Regions:
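A short, Lys/Arg-rich alpha-helix, primarily the initiator
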Residues: 2-26, 70-74
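Generic structural marker for isolated residues within well-ordered, non-membrane alpha-helices
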Residues: 20, 31, 60
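Alpha-helical structural elements of signaling/regulatory helical domains
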Residues: 29, 54-55
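Short alpha-helical "recognition helix" segments of helix-turn-helix
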Residues: 34-35
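Recognition helix of helix-turn-helix/homeodomain-like DNA-binding domains
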Residues: 40-54
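DNA major-groove recognition helix of helix-turn-helix/homeodomain DNA-binding modules
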Residues: 57-74
């Protein structure tokens, strides 16, 4: 059995924390592996999905964008 490289993608915007959780389950995606792939701490992703973080700045903000919880800002 060979291991294939997984190419994770950001979740489509807009998502709620509940819909993002369901997305991971529906697509069989491991949240820890997804967080590692994008360089996020697992706890940041988990707290965003539980609604404990809002993703206002820093790593939480970037993770919220990748999770589809926030729209990507126009620069």
């Amino acid at each position: 059995m060979s291991r294939q490289a997984i190419d994770f993608k950001p979740l489509p915007y807009p998502q709620t924390p509940k819909s993002a959780q369901k997305y991971f389950v529906r697509h069989g995606i491991n949240r820890s592996a997804w967080a590692r792939y994008f360089g996020f701490e697992r706890t940041v992703v988990e707290h965003l999905l539980r609604g404990q973080l809002k993703g206002r700045r820093g790593m939480a903000h970037e993770a919220a964008i990748k999770l589809g919880l926030k729209e990507k800002p126009e620069d």
